[in-house]
Amino acid sequence: MNIYYKNFKKYDTKIYNIIKKEIIRQEEHIELIASENYASKYVMQMQGSLLTNKYAEGYPKNRYYRGCKYIDEIEDLAIKRAKKLFNVDYVNVQPHSGSQANFAVYSALLNPGDLVLGMKLNHGGHLTHGSKANFSGKMYKFISYGVNGEGKLDYNKLLNLANYYRPKMIVGGFSSYSGFINWKKMRFISDKVGAYLFADISHVAGLIVAGIYPNAIPYAHVVTTTTHKTLSGPRGGLILAKEGDDEFYKKLDSAVFPGTQGGPLMHIIAAKAVAFKEAMTLKFKKYQHQLVKNSKSMVEIFLKRKFHVVSGGTKNHLFILNLSNIGLKGDLASEILEKANITVNKNSIPNDKLNPKITSGIRIGTPAITKRGFKEIESKKVAEWICDILENINDKKLINNIKIKVINLCYKYPVYKSFK
């Protein structure tokens, strides 16, 4: 607990004890939620810095408050590093989250009620890609596209939808799709109907900068991403663009501030700058390659054990297990796995007949386990344990024995050594 002030335990024992329990949970659980990762100590130090004190509405050299000389330097550095990392002309580092970044893009380029194509939520899309429960589906008219019977993105169907509806924007990206996206085809379809191509690369940004996932940036008019997930930075958002004009970039900036946000979170922007520096290293690229290897090695075990993997495999850091063929629901599966200290999330499958609170599947991702040092051997072992549990959900002794094995494995690969 040495990242906390020595006297904090005395000052607020309740919060201290809760955080201590969460540290133990993170250390003793195998984290397989695809959107979660472990930030470095350097990133966390920035998030806990005195930069949280400074209000800085506006942009560098154009603030509404005084005292921003060094704040400007930090934001400029974050922008400079992001431009280099992603090879882009435009960056906005201020969005508080991926959803905020997406909202800003919609606000900049659309009017309420405009027609947009987005990936269907239970086919792998995200809430902000047109879900009726989300602002995107309430403010704009979304038509959903999805995957074919093999679980692959159906570009022919997308083209037909685009030709029929003539949308103002097509959104590409996902939260639970295990394949590649052909951005060139996406741009072709967008150009065919005169639509903006907006790419949300939140899940695969780390893979893209490492050169192992198709890059959306040369094809999309605008790109957003989160800065955690595979990028392994602080929780936050980012807007990127290349080869646009000043007017286009001003629209995006204005949509963030003053359009959808007030003051930026400078402690988070500093943490983003640190994460961008980390992402430029050879170590980071090796990490990205390993997390895909780990994902594929887990799929290999599930297929060997006759489990149904949506789309038949994975080309990135995640995949979906369809549990309907074994009569198991996603919410129950995730609950039982948690008893063995294995954390996954319930997830809808394409054309799921169950509602999103129950689901027919679970999503599995490898960013966190890879960050703590797991390689193919450990990943396969974890996959075997998951299979054993899902095939024997009422065997409490087996589940407890696997829990002990999980804890022992976790302590061989600590997340943060100094927290023990």
Swiss-Prot record:
Pfam families reported for this sequence: SHMT (PF00464)
Which Gene Ontology terms of cellular component type are present?
A: cytosol
Known catalytic reactions: (6R)-5,10-methylene-5,6,7,8-tetrahydrofolate + glycine + H2O = (6S)-5,6,7,8-tetrahydrofolate + L-serine
Which EC number applies? 2.1.2.1
Which InterPro entries is this protein grouped with?
PyrdxlP-dep_Trfase, PyrdxlP-dep_Trfase_major, PyrdxlP-dep_Trfase_small, Ser_HO-MeTrfase, Ser_HO-MeTrfase-like, Ser_HO-MeTrfase_PLP_BS, SHMT-like_dom
Q: Which GO terms describe its biological process?
A: glycine biosynthetic process from serine; tetrahydrofolate interconversion
Q: Which residues carry this modification: N6-(pyridoxal phosphate)lysine?
A: 229
> Which GO MF terms does the UniProt record name?
glycine hydroxymethyltransferase activity; pyridoxal phosphate binding
Cofactor(s) annotated in UniProt? pyridoxal 5'-phosphate
Question: Which positions bind (6S)-5,6,7,8-tetrahydrofolate?
Answer: 121, 125-127
Pathway of this protein?
One-carbon metabolism; tetrahydrofolate interconversion; Amino-acid biosynthesis; glycine biosynthesis; glycine from L-serine: step 1/1
Where does the protein end up? Cytoplasm
Note the site residues: Plays an important role in substrate specificity.
228
Q: Which domain of life is it from?
A: Bacteria
Is the Transmembrane keyword given for this protein? no
List keywords of the entry alphabetically: Amino-acid biosynthesis, Cytoplasm, One-carbon metabolism, Pyridoxal phosphate, Transferase
**Which family does the entry's similarity section mention?**
Belongs to the SHMT family.
Report the protein's function.
Catalyzes the reversible interconversion of serine and glycine with tetrahydrofolate (THF) serving as the one-carbon carrier. This reaction serves as the major source of one-carbon groups required for the biosynthesis of purines, thymidylate, methionine, and other important biomolecules. Also exhibits THF-independent aldolase activity toward beta-hydroxyamino acids, producing glycine and aldehydes, via a retro-aldol mechanism.
Quaternary structure per UniProt?
A: Homodimer.
Q: What is this protein called?
A: Serine hydroxymethyltransferase
